[in-house]
């Protein structure tokens, strides 16, 4: 059988990639598993964890496996970093915790970006791969379950910290210590990134198999239930504080659109404090009838 030149070149290249390659700069063969880099990272084992060329049911199955395996590794790292966060909060090491929280946020945000690679797979291709996945679902992910468990521990460590400092989340946002407010915001960053990842997964499901009461995931549940999971918070008290702040918000003391604000900083008041003494800032007069609206 005659093959096109293009096919021959591709086949030859594919075979070359499956064998050790000579690096002219190092003057060594890479891929034999003998070099320090390969030994330390266990690359022979790592690169053999995916189905082989003749085992794949579709070309995109390699991408599917690589992305999911990478997600598990990142979730493992995020979980272990979160355990360190628990230790840091318990010893009041807030500077160290702040730096580590930034790392966790970047890891979790990266999870969402990685899922975008899977969006390049068309639904008909996924339906072929799906036949070989058994009843597997994201709920069975070790990394997902590890991170949820670690986050629960972090939430408890946060509560212990607030108890030691005699603070509440609501009190922190009403003029509490700046270091704790910063911590609250960074914890919320983690939570928001996590929910963003769940949303990215939801969109991936929607794009590949559809979201509807009639569409069942491999675990037998309707894909429609995924929508509710996206907004389940890791740190509920931080979100509840927003609701409480808004519930106690007062319009009085603001500025009418277009009115002069000169001199008002000296008499500025909290949006949640009792009304200002009459005359403290003349520009505040008559604002209760100002037009309402949020941006």
Explain the meaning of each model-derived region.
Residues 1-295:
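Surface-exposed peri-terminal alpha-helical interaction modules
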